[in-house]
């Protein structure tokens, strides 16, 4: 059986790791043993933070919507409740974008939300009043 030399394969693997470690600080960028650990850890961080990015953006959208609805005298929770009761299904990303770039359209949505909340408040009897009567 012929002898197998793995110099080419090992060199290619090392180059791949060092390429991924480009831009790292200190020996993490040019020492293969340390670079391999640093690249592995960076991939773990990347995986974790791809999940966190979704949470962070949703929180940012909610903050923007809340700020915009409070300018119109409504809280975020009441606004979303009003939209749901009005049958308007717009996701938070679009709502936040509308709040920033199209204030008139957003104001119309707030008005619809308020109207649906008022309508339901006037038509639905209060639980306390019905219990007393």
UniProtKB/Swiss-Prot annotation:
Alphabetical list of InterPro entries matching this protein: Ribosomal_bL20, RIBOSOMAL_L20_CS, Ribosomal_protein_bL20_C
A GO cellular component annotation in the UniProt record: ribonucleoprotein complex
Pfam families, A to Z: Ribosomal_L20
Keywords for the protein's UniProt record, in alphabetical order: Ribonucleoprotein, Ribosomal protein, RNA-binding, rRNA-binding
Any Gene Ontology biological process: translation
GO molecular function: rRNA binding; structural constituent of ribosome
Function, in words: Binds directly to 23S ribosomal RNA and is necessary for the in vitro assembly process of the 50S ribosomal subunit. It is not involved in the protein synthesizing functions of that subunit.
Family (UniProt): Belongs to the bacterial ribosomal protein bL20 family.
Protein name: Large ribosomal subunit protein bL20
Lineage per the UniProt record: Bacteria, Pseudomonadati, Pseudomonadota, Alphaproteobacteria, Hyphomicrobiales
Gene (name only): rplT
